[in-house]
Amino acid sequence: MKKRWNSVFKLVLMVTAILGLSLYVTTSQGVEVRAESITQPTAINVIFPDPALANAIKIAAGKSNVTDTVTQADLDGITTLSAFGTGVTTIEGVQYLNNLIGLELKDNQITDLTPLKNLTKITELELSGNPLKNVSAIAGLQSIKTLDLTSTQITDVTPLAGLSNLQVLYLDLNQITNISPLAGLTNLQYLSIGNAQVSDLTPLANLSKLTTLKADDNKISDISPLASLPNLIEVHLKNNQISDVSPLANTSNLFIVTLTNQTITNQPVFYQNNLVVPNVVKGPSGAPIAPATISDNGTYASPNLTWNLTSFINNVSYTFNQSVTFKNTTVPFSGTVTQPLTEAYTAVFDVDGKQTSVTVGANELIKEPTAPTKEGYTFTGWYDAKTGGTKWDFATDKMPAEDITLYAQFTINSYTATFDIDGKLTTQKVTYQSLLEEPVAPTKDGYTFTGWYDAKTGGTKWDFATGKMPAGNITLYAQFTKNDNPNPDDPTTNTPTGNGDGTSNPSNSGGNTTLPTAGDENTMLPIFIGVFLLGTATLILRKTIKVK
């Protein structure tokens, strides 16, 4: 029985090894695994429940009716599929088209691209005009070379970051603001991103194969990232916010450029009767381009525009319209520059009568000044009154349409006065510039108290009638002078009572005790020696008895 089980065990091990080896060989040789497949002939409209898509499959498979059955081999024979503007709402079933290379689904009502996620052979994908909003399902389709996502309601192009073989990309008519995920698409040759919300072209700076950029109707103001693109042939930039076209001056292959109808809005400046504004419009050489028209009777003397205004207005403006020449082409460059004006008001900062001021536009935040300092006080904030009033919040409170004064307010500080009597400490809390309360004069045997000083020895005596608390903690030290005779009223103090020869006088001792004379200090020595000898003899005697 035991041998039988051993044989079975060996057989199982052998089968497992063979299966494992087969799996390794299969995977190592790169055999393609189908994403999904049907196992038996099935009606087209069962596999593809959307009627419009089923009809497109019928045509692609060469069938006469959507109820006809197809096999997986039939589906594998479909390499391109078109369902243009037919009202497709779902692409369920497309996951079985394992050899699909080209897919056109323009102008439908598709919202979910999940069935596409494993169709890795697709090279051309046309999805424009669908309310997709999210295209994360195509993030892994690295074979795609042409992708059209025009008017698909997408805002995030992050799923496109890994499509490294992408050569042609349409992103027009979407609310896209950030194109940073495109920075790694180094094979990109054609990019169309018109009518979006793009303002920064920096992610394109390293796309050296880019030949065509269509970016009309955006919010682009800086085109300097395009200066590093040597193969750029065609650039469309009309209806943007571009004021300086000099970055394109040295682009040697540039033949087609559109730069008309730029709308430039400068940062607001304060209104002045005599307003001077620099001209921001620059041509290919970097030199200013003279205005074509100037509002409000303004004048131009390069590089500045000047207006003499009699009263406040919200803005002034000027237009430009001039042909500019690049290496291979001359094109019109036109637009309008608007200079917003802010009516200026004065915010005065008052620190105990000393004033500074800043000019601030109405409804703008006031920049908080450096907190003032005042000896003996703590700054509590800026208020709209000298005392009381409301504290100004520089994070939220905005300048009214009038001049204002803000007052620095302070609270007086309290400090600690420490009284030190030979290391024994007591304290008082005293407000700045107030008088200290004089403690009770301390006493010390044999000494006379002389006062409180600002040092342990020496120093300056504190005058409690006039000395005021400084802006800091202080320590005052009790100082004393030693008395010459600690008890001058006692005639017996320090009076000797002996006979004059070093011996005591019994009659003056007040008792019968005899005090030792000068030679009696060693009278205990004989007693000690006697006790020692007695103890030694006793010890010797005890040892002698034990021996016997």
Curated annotation (Swiss-Prot):
Propeptide ranges are: 519-548
Describe the function of this protein. Contributes to systemic listeriosis in mice by decreasing host IL-6 cytokine production and thus evasion of the host immune response. Does not contribute to invasion of the host intestinal tissue.
Protein name as annotated: Internalin H
The residues the entry assigns to the signal sequence are 1-30
Extent of Polar residues compositional bias: 504-516
Matching entries from InterPro entries are given as: Cu-Rt/internalin_Ig-like (IPR014755), Ig_E-set (IPR014756), Inl_IR (IPR012569), InlB-like_B-rpt (IPR013378), Internalin_N (IPR024634), Leu-rich_rpt (IPR001611), Leu-rich_rpt_4 (IPR025875), Leu-rich_rpt_typical-subtyp (IPR003591)
What family does this chain come from, according to its entry?
Belongs to the internalin family.
